[in-house]
Regions:
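Bacterial Sec-dependent N-terminal signal peptides
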Residues: 1-23
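Carbohydrate-interacting regions of secretory-pathway proteins
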Residues: 19-222
Length: 222
């Protein structure tokens, strides 16, 4: 009995140790204080020119007003990774999308020069559509053994809906590894693609007409 007891204790501590070690492999892309490691790009104003504070940080949250189309993008590139981001919608919407569903997005494998929108793979963040793929600017992939693209922009609709109601926090995960990309919404796999034609690049978060908040953006390189 004592032997079983001690074996259980050792097993418990081993599991906890491995979990802590795994958690520590994730590193923050957003530090909760400022936009260090990122720069902004706005369609009307260009790079690192944000006089109307479309992007700001307060109380540990990244606020994106959505008032202008653009994005913040990492200064460095990533190849194989597991990205975790937590977001929720704000209340405000702006032209030309003031009467449409709220829209945002996380693009990865960004390889082209700055523009709206650069060549990349997008994990759609939009009311009712979180987890859709957008293959932007002739990117290709294989989904369910069917070639997707190349066209200007190709949408691949998610297979499951697992979003929380507007105003609540949602957890988005993107796993990109050796040409296979997986989108996870609140712990459920909603979309997968293989043979993605991009394999490395930067990561961006869009501003696209809707007020959006992020409280966590972290990454583990694989």
């Amino acid at each position: 009995m004592n032997r079983n007891y001690y074996s259980s204790i050792i097993l418990l501590f081993s599991v906890l140790f491995l979990k802590q070690a795994d958690d520590k492999e994730f590193k923050p892309l957003f530090n909760g204080k400022d936009l260090g490691g990122w720069y902004s790009f706005l369609k009307s104003k260009g790079k690192s020119n944000d006089p109307d504070t479309i992007f700001s940080v307060k109380d540990g949250l990244l606020k994106i007003t959505g008032k202008e189309f653009g994005y913040i993008v990492t200064e460095r590139s990533f190849t194989n990774f597991h990205l975790v981001a937590e977001f929720k919608w704000g209340e405000k919407k702006y032209p030309p999308r003031e009467s449409r569903v709220r829209d945002n997005g996380i693009c990865y494998y960004v390889v082209s020069t700055d523009k709206v929108w650069p060549r990349s793979v997008e994990c759609q963040i939009q009311e009712g559509d979180c987890g859709d793929f957008w293959l932007i600017d002739s990117v290709t992939a294989v989904v369910d053994s069917i070639q997707q693209g190349p066209t200007k922009n190709t949408r691949v609709i998610k297979k499951k809906d697992n979003e929380r109601p507007t105003g609540e926090w949602n957890r988005i995960e993107i796993i990109a590894n050796q040409g296979k990309c997986t989108h996870i919404v609140n712990g459920v796999v909603v979309n997968e693609a293989e043979d993605v034609s991009l394999r490395t690049g930067r990561i961006l978060i869009q501003s696209e007409g809707a007020e959006t908040y992020y409280r966590k953006i972290e990454i583990k390189e694989l």
